[in-house]
UniProtKB/Swiss-Prot annotation:
Keywords: ATP-binding, Kinase, Lipid A biosynthesis, Lipid biosynthesis, Lipid metabolism, Nucleotide-binding, Transferase. One of its GO terms (biological process) is lipid A biosynthetic process. Transfers the gamma-phosphate of ATP to the 4'-position of a tetraacyldisaccharide 1-phosphate intermediate (termed DS-1-P) to form tetraacyldisaccharide 1,4'-bis-phosphate (lipid IVA). This is Tetraacyldisaccharide 4'-kinase. NCBIfam families: lpxK. Its EC number is 2.7.1.130.
Length: 321
């Protein structure tokens, strides 16, 4: 897993991006070789795969949460499979209430509030657990580039601000794969944090399967206080923008690497920064679950997905999956 902040050259090419291109070519070749040699397995239920083409937050977790609520409302049984980023997980496990983010990943802890969740780093290990749970649908979070299992329905999430960055593969750029193939194969494309009617040029060929989505706060936060914001997620800028758009007075920011595991020393430093700014700490749900075992008084901004075409989503999901 790449534990980096999103470097500027991933968005706008410079000499560093070009110097890293030879490594990107190796990455591309290894990906091609992996896909060529893979023998995909059929999982024992219909599979909805939610993924993206690039490193960094694109709203996948919120899409998975939305799908979970949608399926639950239809009384469709489902299991969520998550990748256990940032955890010390050794083998696939069904998440229970006592699990921590360090054991199963921050996303797993969050998603477990919406239904049964299996955390794994190897997709093939989930089969016995799926057979025990017997779901109608498997929602797979962030295995889009994994060639070892069959996908019945794919959703590609795209951040409206970053799109596909500088267009280069890792590490010269943010791309896990070039987008055209993924977009062509996708059943739906979510353009996340899009507040405008204008569709980016690269997505215009896919307008018939494009859904505009916004990530919005799902609860009220006291707007009379000052806040010092911090996060260790893939797209912290979007989180900070959400805070400002919500009308909070943000006096300072601190960014940590994606899926960062906080130490007591980090917490003490954050409290010190908040005190300097006469502010209360505020963070994301993904970060907040890391502090379960630490004495803290941190405000958590919970968010949810709002989409412009729920009927299109319902039609495609229940028609094909």
């Amino acid at each position: 897993m790449i534990k980096l902040l999103y470097p500027e050259f991933w968005q706008k090419r410079n000499i560093i991006a070009y110097l890293l291109l030879p490594i990107s070519l190796i990455y591309q070749f290894l990906g091609y070789l992996r896909a060529s040699l893979a023998r995909p397995i059929m999982l024992p239920a219909k599979v909805i795969c939610v993924g993206n083409c690039s490193v960094g937050g694109t709203g996948k977790t919120q899409i998975v949460m939305y799908l979970a609520k949608l399926l639950k409302a239809r009384n469709v049984s489902f299991v969520i499979v998550t990748k256990a980023y940032g955890s010390n997980l050794k083998s696939a496990t069904t998440i229970h209430q006592g699990h921590t983010a360090l054991e199963v990943g921050d996303e797993g802890v969050i998603l477990a509030k919406y239904g049964a969740v299996i955390a794994t780093k190897n997709i093939k290990e989930i089969v016995p657990l799926i057979n025990e749970l017997k779901p109608d649908i498997i929602i797979v979070d962030d295995f889009l580039q994994n060639p070892y299992f069959h996908k019945d329905f794919t959703i590609v999430s795209v951040d409206s601000q970053r799109l596909f960055g500088n267009g280069f593969l890792i590490p010269a750029g943010p791309l896990r794969q070039y987008p055209n193939k993924a977009l062509d194969a996708a059943d739906l494309i979510f353009l996340v944090s899009s507040h405008q009617d204008k569709i980016p040029k690269i997505l215009t060929p896919y307008v018939n399967k494009l859904i505009n989505a916004q990530i919005v706060p799902s609860h009220n936060i006291d707007k009379t206080k000052n806040y010092f914001a911090f996060s260790g997620i893939g797209n912290p800028e979007r989180f900070f923008a959400t805070l400002k758009n919500y009308g909070l007075n943000i006096t300072g920011y601190k960014i940590f690497p994606d899926h960062y595991n906080y130490l007591q020393a980090d917490l003490e430093n954050l409290y010190s920064l908040a005190k300097e700014h006469n502010a209360t700490l505020v963070t994301t749900r993904k970060d907040h679950v890391k502090f379960n075992d630490l004495n803290n008084n941190i405000v958590c901004l919970d968010v949810e997905l709002s989409i412009n075409h729920p009927d299109l989503l319902n039609e495609k999901i229940f028609k094909k999956a």
